[in-house]
């Protein structure tokens, strides 16, 4: 924790692990990972780094390479490789957790790298899973590993590297040990497994850290006082923040949320600052059971870090301080609580974060000056020298002028901001008025176009009606002409049939006359031959008689019915 407002501590205890940020690449949170592995069982999301967020840079490329392994081509290649591995040589995560180290290591040496990567990915999916099945599987694996007595630094030396990474990931619940871009040495992995090295990859200190042999560092397996909370046993990478509280006396760190929740932040007097009142907010360290005042620590954090905070970070830090001093009974703590609440409201209303940071720093200066005044008045109220009084008055005047300048600058900035907003509104109104006039003109234009289209539609409708009337008349004329044509065709067919029959009848009469004359001639010649020579052939005479009778009968037959010839006008006579 930071120094008090009146102390001159040799180094400023800013939030934890500031000295480690420059050395490691993993600066963002691997989640808050618990080190209390014995009585309490947590889900992978609580005890493991299943919510880890990797930093930018090479580690992001590592994550991309991991995602590329899940593509179809890579998966198909992995499946093909796994098909070539016999069932006797295959190793599962449960085998690694249950079976002897040397037996599993011997089998894993015969396995291809693709199969080992698939094995690590399977465990990662279990650690990442939030479903009950994944949680139960992780709890089972962790229980099996932690219940084994043969896993020591001696036996783990013979382990395969992937086997050791899987065992460490199961034991700690941190999937970062399975990441391809994080490669720790085998001795480091063994020390992490047996709780002799901090499992925080960005810390990696030997345990106990700083040769601390307090109850917490001694009795909690894997606890590191440089990066882990004394209450929840988890670590993260938050620095330059009020999220962590450090003890002035033993330098152990605690989450502010955990301290508030467990009642470690309370009212009392500090063991280090005898000038603190009985109602001042103090922090009671769980490691050394001693108290440290928090007002000076908050002041130190804001003096060193507030200028670098953005808007969201500043609001979060003010909220932390407000929650810390909510129950304060002394005047300074109550003023700080009210000031934080006021600044949070102003920032939400549009106050710039730089101005808010200046105001809170000025507030701390006021509190310090008020404390100095109270201390001077408490020493008997001795009279000040004229020069000191003048200097003090000058300081007060300068401080007042500085405050007035800041307020004036803020008001001027707000005035300029309001004026710019007003000008923007005026421009927007002008633009909207132009848009309205354009819309009206466009609407009038559209209305004229609609009227023109309606007129054209009416004209086209009238033309269509006219053409329809003409079409009806043309159709009636066509029907009349068709009836005339049909009547003329019927009449011409009748005339043709009558003429044809008359022609055929005349031809038949001529032929009959011809035949009759021929028969008559033959009969005359026959009669002449009979008179001259005697009788003729009786059969021939009979034939001529029949022919004559037929011709006479044909001459007496009735006329042909014209209706029959109409139905078949081109029929030949028999």
UniProtKB/Swiss-Prot annotation:
Disruption phenotype: No visible phenotype. When associated with OBE1 disruption, plants exhibit premature termination of the shoot meristem and impaired root apical meristem establishment, leading to a diminutive phenotype characterized by an absence of roots and defective development of the vasculature. Induction: By auxin in the root elongation zone. InterPro entries: OBE1-like_PHD, OBERON, Oberon-like_PHD, Oberon_cc, Znf_PHD. The keyword Transcription applies. GO terms for molecular function: identical protein binding; zinc ion binding. One of its GO terms (cellular component) is nucleus. Residues 1-76 are annotated as: Disordered. It holds the Pfam family PHD_Oberon. Keywords: Coiled coil, Developmental protein, Host-virus interaction, Metal-binding, Nucleus, Transcription, Transcription regulation, Zinc, Zinc-finger. Residues 416-524 form a coiled coil. It is found in: Nucleus. Its main location: nucleus. A zinc finger (PHD-type) spans 226-291. Expressed in roots, seedlings, stems, leaves, flowers and siliques, especially in the vasculature. Disulfide bonds: none annotated. The keyword Coiled coil applies. GO terms for biological process: embryo development ending in seed dormancy; maintenance of root meristem identity; maintenance of shoot apical meristem identity; primary root development; regulation of gene expression; root meristem specification; transport of virus in host, cell to cell. Residues 1-10, 65-76 have a biased composition (Polar residues). Self-interacts. Interacts with OBE1, OBE3 and OBE4. Binds to VPg of pea seed borne mosaic virus (PSbMV), turnip mosaic virus (TuMV) and lettuce mosaic virus (LMV), but not with VPg of tobacco etch virus (TEV), cowpea mosaic virus (CPMV), tomato black ring virus (TBRV) and grapevine fan leaf virus (GFLV). Probable transcription factor that acts together with OBE1 for the maintenance and/or establishment of both the shoot and root meristems, probably by controlling the expression of the meristem genes such as WUS, PLT1 and PLT2 and of genes required for auxin responses. Promotes cell meristematic activity via the WUSCHEL-CLAVATA pathway. Involved in the development of the basal pole and in auxin-mediated root and vascular development in the embryo. Confers sensitivity to turnip mosaic virus (TuMV) probably by promoting viral movement and multiplication via interaction with TuMV VPg. PANTHER family: PROTEIN OBERON 2 (PTHR21736:SF37), VERNALIZATION-INSENSITIVE PROTEIN 3 (PTHR21736). This is Protein OBERON 2. It comes from Arabidopsis thaliana.
């Amino acid at each position: 924790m930071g120094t008090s407002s009146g102390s001159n501590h040799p180094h400023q205890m800013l939030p934890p692990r500031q000295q480690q940020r420059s050395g490691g690449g993993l600066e963002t949170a691997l989640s808050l990972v618990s080190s209390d592995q014995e009585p309490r069982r947590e889900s992978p999301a609580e005890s493991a780094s299943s919510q880890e967020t990797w930093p930018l840079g090479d580690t992001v490329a590592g994550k991309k390479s991991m995602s590329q392994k899940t593509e179809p081509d890579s998966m198909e290649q992995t499946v093909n490789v796994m098909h070539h591995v016999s069932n006797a040589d295959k190793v599962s995560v449960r085998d690694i957790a249950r079976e002897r180290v040397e037996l599993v290591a011997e089998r894993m040496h015969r396995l291809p790298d693709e199969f080992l990567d698939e094995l690590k990915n399977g465990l990662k999916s279990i650690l990442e899973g939030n479903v009950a099945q994944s949680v139960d599987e992780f709890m089972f694996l962790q229980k099996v590993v932690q219940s084994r007595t043969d896993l020591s630094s001696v036996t783990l030396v013979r382990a395969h590297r992937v086997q050791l990474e899987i065992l460490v990931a199961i034991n700690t619940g941190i999937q970062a040990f399975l990441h391809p871009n994080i490669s720790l040495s085998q001795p480091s992995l063994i020390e992490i497994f047996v709780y002799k090295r901090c499992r925080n990859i960005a810390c990696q200190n030997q345990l106990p850290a700083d040769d601390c042999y307090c109850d917490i560092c001694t009795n909690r397996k894997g606890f590191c006082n440089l990066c882990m909370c004394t209450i929840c046993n988890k670590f993260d990478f938050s620095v330059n923040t009020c999220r962590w509280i450090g003890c002035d006396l033993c330098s152990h760190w605690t989450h502010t949320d955990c301290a508030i929740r467990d009642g470690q932040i309370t009212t009392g007097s500090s063991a280090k600052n005898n000038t603190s009142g009985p109602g001042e907010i103090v922090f009671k360290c769980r490691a050394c059971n001693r108290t440290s005042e928090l007002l000076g620590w908050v002041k130190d954090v804001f003096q060193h870090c507030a200028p670098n905070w953005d808007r969201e970070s500043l609001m979060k830090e003010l909220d932390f301080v407000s929650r810390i001093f909510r129950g304060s009974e002394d005047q300074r703590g109550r003023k700080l609580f009210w000031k934080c609440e006021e600044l949070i409201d102003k920032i939400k209303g549009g106050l710039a974060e730089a101005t808010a940071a200046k105001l809170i720093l000025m507030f701390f200066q006021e509190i310090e000056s008020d404390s100095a005044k109270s201390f001077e008045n408490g020493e008997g109220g001795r009279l000040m020298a004229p020069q000191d009084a003048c200097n003090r008055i000058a300081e007060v005047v300068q401080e007042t002028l500085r405050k007035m300048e800041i307020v004036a600058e803020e008001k001027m900035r707000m005035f300029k901001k309001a004026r710019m907003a007003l000008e923007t509104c005026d421009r927007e109104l002008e633009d909207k008025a132009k848009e309205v006039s354009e819309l009206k003109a466009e609407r009038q234009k559209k209305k004229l176009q609609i009227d023109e289209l309606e007129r054209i539609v009416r004209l086209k409708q009238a033309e269509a009606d006219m053409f329809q009337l003409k079409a009806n008349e043309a159709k009636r004329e066509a029907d009349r002409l068709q009836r005339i044509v049909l009547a003329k065709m019927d009449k011409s067919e009748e005339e043709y049939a009558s003429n044809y029959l008359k022609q055929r009848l005349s031809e038949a009469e001529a032929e009959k006359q011809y035949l009759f004359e021929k028969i008559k001639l033959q009969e005359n010649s026959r009669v002449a031959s009979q008179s001259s020579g005697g009788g003729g052939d009786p059969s021939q005479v009979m034939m001529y008689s029949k022919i004559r009778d037929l011709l006479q009968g044909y001459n007496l037959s009735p006329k042909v019915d014209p209706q029959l010839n109409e139905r078949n006008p081109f029929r030949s006579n028999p």
